[in-house]
């Protein structure tokens, strides 16, 4: 018998786009331009208000943690670029730091200066990318264009150092692959002068813009207790008055020797988080200027020395038999860290990024677990979106600054 489908009973299994009451089920994504990746939100709306939100993730899942268990430690390093691909060096560094704690090597001072400088350049790239994308999501297209000019300068710096603009592979276990190229510090110094001018321009266009304020203020409010319950970190926590930055409170690399502040806000809304992204860029510029002054007086070594785990300098590999054999073994068979486990947290541009590594003395990790901030920040949407209007989703989603490379691992 032929069925007759009416407006209230469409021919879609288990999906009712229009119902007899005012409620509606709507799919946001997984290919929506404001989704910041492969995000699908299953929304239940009552008129224009969200009464239920269910994030559906996994569209970008690649099994990265399992891949690590089948790769030697150095082989896995380029794969970490594919987590937060907006600030790839932060992933390289977090993994390298975890392995270094496991094998117990000391990093040369110059390598620490270079690594910290690259991390802060990446932080600026990530934050300024967020400002541009948030502006575009809310309707301020010109902000996107101004911010991407500065982002291009930052990517040019990374390209000058490692040859890559997005997936950098710029860190090595035990140090860095290269010293800074000729005139690199001069280019970085120009970058530190141009970024504040762009930020002043952005703030001049947005801070007193009535539409911008209406779209962000009192939208996406997160209280301190709510942030703690959901294990939020980075600006998502600091925007709610939680003064916690791993660089300051559990310092690594050179951060304990550097002068910088941890800006916080108490309002907890999208506008407060927007302000913090800008303030953090200023603090990163302050750190970079200190590192520029510190670099010339450092010894020239850029890699730790431990024949069990780290290859000799290339000059020795080319001229000494023992160094060549050691290098061959490390490349083909891999290092063998001692039995043990370690968890090392770092402050990535998105929040707390940590690697848990369990070693059984083999060339590959027995278990590797990655604690990524975006995973927690996307989960919070199932409560954060409730009560907001559908039009608020792009503004709220942008302020979380999630990237799906580190959510779908």
From Swiss-Prot:
<comment type="subunit">
    <text>NDH-1 is composed of 14 different subunits. Subunits NuoB, C, D, E, F, and G constitute the peripheral sector of the complex.</text>
</comment>
<keyword id="KW-0520">NAD</keyword>
<keyword id="KW-0997">Cell inner membrane</keyword>
<dbReference type="InterPro" id="IPR001135">
    <property type="entry name" value="NADH_Q_OxRdtase_suD"/>
</dbReference>
<keyword id="KW-1003">Cell membrane</keyword>
<dbReference type="InterPro" id="IPR029014">
    <property type="entry name" value="NiFe-Hase_large"/>
</dbReference>
<dbReference type="GO" id="GO:0050136">
    <property type="term" value="F:NADH:ubiquinone reductase (non-electrogenic) activity"/>
</dbReference>
<protein>
    <recommendedName>
        <fullName>NADH-quinone oxidoreductase subunit D</fullName>
        <ecNumber>7.1.1.-</ecNumber>
    </recommendedName>
</protein>
<dbReference type="GO" id="GO:0005886">
    <property type="term" value="C:plasma membrane"/>
</dbReference>
<keyword id="KW-0813">Transport</keyword>
<keyword id="KW-1278">Translocase</keyword>
<keyword id="KW-0472">Membrane</keyword>
<keyword id="KW-0874">Quinone</keyword>
<dbReference type="Pfam" id="PF00346">
    <property type="entry name" value="Complex1_49kDa"/>
</dbReference>
<comment type="similarity">
    <text>Belongs to the complex I 49 kDa subunit family.</text>
</comment>
<dbReference type="InterPro" id="IPR022885">
    <property type="entry name" value="NDH1_su_D/H"/>
</dbReference>
<comment type="function">
    <text>NDH-1 shuttles electrons from NADH, via FMN and iron-sulfur (Fe-S) centers, to quinones in the respiratory chain. The immediate electron acceptor for the enzyme in this species is believed to be ubiquinone. Couples the redox reaction to proton translocation (for every two electrons transferred, four hydrogen ions are translocated across the cytoplasmic membrane), and thus conserves the redox energy in a proton gradient.</text>
</comment>
<dbReference type="GO" id="GO:0051287">
    <property type="term" value="F:NAD binding"/>
</dbReference>
<keyword id="KW-0830">Ubiquinone</keyword>
<dbReference type="GO" id="GO:0048038">
    <property type="term" value="F:quinone binding"/>
</dbReference>
């Amino acid at each position: 018998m032929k069925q007759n489908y009416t407006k209230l009973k469409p021919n879609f299994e288990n999906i009712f786009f229009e119902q007899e009451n005012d409620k509606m089920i709507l799919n946001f994504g997984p290919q929506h331009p404001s989704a910041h990746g492969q995000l699908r939100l299953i929304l239940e709306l009552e008129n224009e208000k969200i009464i239920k939100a269910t994030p559906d993730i996994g569209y970008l899942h690649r099994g990265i943690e399992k891949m690590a268990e089948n790769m030697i430690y150095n082989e896995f390093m380029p794969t970490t670029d594919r987590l937060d691909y907006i600030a790839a060096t932060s992933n390289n560094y977090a993994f390298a730091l975890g392995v270094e704690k496991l094998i117990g090597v000391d990093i040369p001072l110059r390598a620490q200066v270079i690594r910290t400088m690259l991390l802060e350049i990446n932080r600026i790239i990530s934050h300024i990318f967020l400002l541009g994308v948030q502006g575009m999501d809310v309707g301020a297209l010109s902000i996107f264009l101004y911010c991407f000019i500065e982002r291009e300068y930052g990517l040019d710096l990374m390209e000058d150092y490692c040859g890559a603009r997005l997936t950098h592979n710029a860190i090595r276990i035990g140090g860095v692959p290269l010293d800074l190229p000729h005139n690199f510090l001069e280019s970085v110094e120009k970058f530190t002068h141009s970024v504040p001018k762009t930020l002043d321009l952005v703030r001049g266009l947005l801070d007193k813009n009535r539409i911008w304020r209406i779209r962000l203020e009192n939208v996406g409010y997160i209280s301190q207790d709510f942030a703690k319950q959901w294990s939020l970190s980075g600006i998502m926590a600091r925007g709610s008055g939680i003064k916690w930055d791993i660089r300051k409170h559990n310092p690594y690399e050179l951060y304990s020797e550097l002068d910088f502040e941890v800006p916080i806000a108490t309002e907890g809304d999208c506008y407060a988080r927007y302000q913090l992204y800008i303030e953090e860029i200023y603090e990163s510029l302050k750190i970079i200027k200190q590192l520029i002054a510190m670099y010339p007086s450092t010894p020239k070594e850029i890699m730790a020395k431990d024949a069990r785990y780290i290859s000799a300098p290339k000059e020795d590999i080319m001229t000494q038999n023992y160094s060549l054999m050691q290098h061959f073994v490390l490349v083909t068979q891999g290092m063998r860290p001692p039995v043990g486990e370690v968890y090392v947290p770092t402050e990535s541009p998105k929040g707390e990024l940590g690697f848990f590594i369990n070693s059984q003395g083999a060339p590959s990790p027995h278990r590797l677990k990655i604690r990524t901030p975006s995973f927690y920040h996307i989960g919070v949407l199932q409560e954060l979106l409730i009560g907001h209007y559908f039009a608020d989703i792009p503004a709220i989603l942008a302020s979380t600054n999630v990237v799906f490379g580190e959510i779908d691992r």
